[in-house]
Structure formats: C-alpha cells, structure tokens
UniProtKB/Swiss-Prot annotation:
GN (gene name): murB
One term of GO molecular function: UDP-N-acetylmuramate dehydrogenase activity
Top-level lineage group: Bacteria
Cofactor(s) the record lists: FAD
Residue ranges of domain FAD-binding PCMH-type in the record: 35-199
Name of the protein: UDP-N-acetylenolpyruvoylglucosamine reductase
Cited function: Cell wall formation.
C-alpha cells in the first residue's frame, strides 16, 4: 500500500528544514518485528531546533506520530497516514553524567543510560541495562525491570508540543503509572535527566551482569520480537496465564508465541503484522476464557490494518 506523496508540499512550507523528509518510506526495517507498511512521510530531524521548526510549520490536519527503535511496536500492514517522526542518535542520542545526574537524549538506548551511569560510579539505573528500547520510549511507557521503573529515577524530561514549543516536565508532570505515562500523547520527548546514587563499581557491574544474564536465559533475545506483549495483571504474571491457557507455541501464519517465554510473540520468518496482532488477540481470548482475566496489550499497535491473518 502507498499513500499520496505529501512531502513536496511540506518541504515548500519549510524552506529552512535541515532534517531528512521522505515519502512512502518503509517502516518494517525500523521495527524489531520487521513487519508493517510504510509511513506516508518519515521525518528525521537534525536536532531540537529542527524538530521545533518542523512542528511549528506542520499543518494541524496532518496526523503526526513519533517512534523510537521500534522495540515495542507493531506497525500494521497498511502503514501510517501523515507524518512519522523518528529521532536519530546523531542529534538525540547523547548521554553524559554530571555529578549524580545522568543526561540522556531520547534516542539513546536504555542500555547506554545504564552504561553511562556505571562509568560515573552511579547506581540505581542498572535496570535499564536489560530494557530494549530508547529513553523516549521509556518515558512514554514508564519502562521498568527488576523491581524499578523510570519513575523511580527520573528528574525531568524535555519535550516539544504539536506547535513546536519546548517544555520541561518534572517527574510529577509525567503522571506515571504501571507501564504508562499520563503526559500529553502529542508531546515528543527529546531528552531526560535521571538521578543516580554513588555506588561501588563492582556492585553496579554485578547488578548489570545479573540483569543481562536473566534476559539471555529467559527471553528470546535473538528472535524477531517486540518484548513483553501484555502487561502483568495485578498480583499475577501474564506469562503464567498464557501458559495455563495452553498458548505456549501457538501459531498464526508466520507468528508464534515463544516457547522460551510465552509473553513474547515472535516473527518466525514471514509473518505479517496481521498475523502477529491476530495471534495476540487469540491469546487474550483464550486467557479470558480460561481465567476470566483480560490481558492488556503492552506493545503499541499503530497504523492501518488491511490484511486478515493467513
């Protein structure tokens, strides 16, 4: 599927644009599942000023969405109308430590945040070492692991609104809850500051090694996957409910529930986005029938659905 090319009109309205603006750009290569259709327009800003300029000139009727490295994302097969904004490491991937504060651009990998803190002998951010994704995604969904979440370390975050205005949100402004931020969904986060705690380098490294070892042992890290598919219900584990419902190894088309960890869906070879989403909905139905519990998606699903699963 392809969309009418809107990039000539956008470029004409933005003569000072420095970033890259492409029409009908495939999104599948930008996601861990490697599925999905194109973006009607894909914009990669050069830096914060370029992003603010683009947003200030973007017509309000044009849909807009920001993505990261696509580690927690299903792009549907029909693609996304409007503009998809993707922050690149070159302009938004810096990390550094200053005293007990760790600064990170929104395109920095979560793992890099943990490494930067460790190099500065700061603990409290080791949990990021095992989270696949970027700081921007961590802010949007209050990413966490091993008993800690983004809300436990965040000082503040910088973002741009739909009109191109720069804003700074404190921890309370983020309205964090389990795997969710109540901040305006139209905001595009560009950086964040985290507070670390001075700690022994050996102790920090030991925690990071433990996080990595657990992930390697328990999760299908070498598959085309998207991380944890469903949120854990209160006082329960999604994977246990999925296993009890007999869904381990279940397949739809080229999509499969992981044998290693059944809260992970994997693209075994040639899955479509429809295969993966249909498999997820089948799992939800079976869990509801078996336990009465309705699982909630943790993976974000975006775009236009066009093909039924095979």
């Amino acid at each position: 599927m392809s969309f009418p090319d809107i990039t000539p009109d956008l470029k004409a309205a933005m003569p000072s644009l420095r970033g890259r603006l492409l029409g009908n750009e495939p999104l599948a290569p930008l996601t861990w599942f490697r599925v999905g259709g194109p973006a009607q327009a894909l914009f990669t800003p050069a830096d914060e000023d370029d992003l603010g300029y683009f947003l200030s000139r973007l017509p309000t009727e044009v849909p807009m969405l920001c993505i990261g490295v696509g580690s927690n994302l299903i792009v549907r097969d029909g693609g996304l109308p409007g503009v998809v904004i993707r922050l690149a490491p070159r302009g938004f991937g810096d990390t550094r430590a200053d005293g007990e504060i760790v600064y990170a651009g929104a395109a920095a990998l979560d793992k890099r945040v943990a490494e930067t803190a460790a190099a500065a002998k700061l603990g409290g951010l080791e949990f990021y070492f095992g989270i696949p994704g970027t700081v921007g995604g961590a802010l949007r969904m209050n990413a966490g692991a091993n008993g800690r979440e983004t809300k436990d370390a965040l000082i503040d975050a910088t973002a741009f609104d739909r009109s191109g205005n720069r804003r700074v949100l404190g921890n309370a402004d983020m309205q964090f809850s389990y795997r969710h931020s109540g901040a305006d969904p139209a905001l595009i986060f560009t950086s964040a500051r985290f507070r670390g705690t001075p700690a022994s380098p050996d102790a920090i490294r030991a925690k990071m090694n433990e996080v990595q070892a657990h992930r390697e042992l328990a999760q299908p890290v070498r598959e085309k996957t998207g991380g944890s598919t469903f949120k854990n219900p209160p006082d329960n584990s999604a994977w246990k409910l999925i296993d009890a419902a007999g869904c381990r190894g279940l397949r739809v088309g080229g999509a499969q529930v992981s044998e290693m960890h059944c809260n992970f869906l994997i693209n075994t070879s040639d899955a479509t986005a429809a295969d993966i989403e249909t498999l997820g909905e089948t799992v939800r139905e079976r869990v509801k029938a078996q336990s009465g519990i309705e699982l909630q998606w943790e993976i974000k699903r975006i775009g236009v659905a066009v093909d039924a699963a095979r």
